[in-house]
Amino acid sequence: MLTATGKQRTYRLFKQNAHNYPRYDSYLAWHGCATCSLATVLGAYNDNYSGILPSSVIDGVEKQFTSNKDWTREHVNRSLRGQMPLSLYGISSILKSSGVDNNYVRTYTDSEAKHDIISHLKTGNSIIFEVRQKNSRTGKRTKRWTNSYHTMVLLGVLTNGKVLLCDSVDRPWYNGGQRLKIVDLSDIMEYMFPCTSFSESMYYNGASSDGGYIKIYEIS
């Protein structure tokens, strides 16, 4: 449970490759970062979904608020390797349809994003964001956060300026693989990226339209 600006909110942290999600073990292990991030935020902001699991997201709000054609394509028709995770647009849309207000920021400069992210976290609200393998500062590809693309959640900012991060994957370089991490914002922003094109696809269909971050707002 986290407390910020006088409010308390309970976030559940999920391990996408825990293999304890019936029917969707393999999908979540391969593609589940977006689903886990959505479950973490939805359960924290809307009491009607308190305790929701990633597998319940797939069979519940994801199925409800995406087209039957798209949902069936990703979870029934395609092979595991060909299946795709929810896009940031898809996450934003499902949250709004589930009563959780948010703003999907697609384009930004690093200086704008740094100020915007810290300011938003200081209100006690979270941010869902995307990173890639390529480091935007050095231009090199690393495995620090992902082998390709990865969705995570920023939960808050500490008094020392570091941010509290919810990651659905264990990483050996951080405290023996702990998924709740305290890191410098710059460590994340070096791997974040803005959109260079616009898409309303509910599922990932290319990095150019899936960058940016989602600012979550308290339900009024």
Where are these regions (language model features)?
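Mid-length scaffold segments of soluble, non-membrane domains
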Residues: 83-104
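A short acidic/basic microdomain associated with nuclease active sites
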Residues: 58, 104-106
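Extracytoplasmic/secreted envelope proteins and their assembly/folding machinery
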Residues: 34-42, 58, 88, 92, ...
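Noncatalytic regulatory segments and standalone regulatory/sensor domains
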Residues: 145-146, 157-220
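Sec/Tat-exported extracytoplasmic proteins
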Residues: 37, 41, 45-49, 65, ...
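Active-site-adjacent structural segments surrounding the nucleophilic cysteine of cysteine proteases
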Residues: 1-83, 142
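Active-site-adjacent substructure of cysteine-protease-like catalytic cores
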Residues: 109-170, 174
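Hydrophobic beta-strand residues in large extracellular and virion-surface proteins
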Residues: 41, 57, 127-129, 152-154, ...
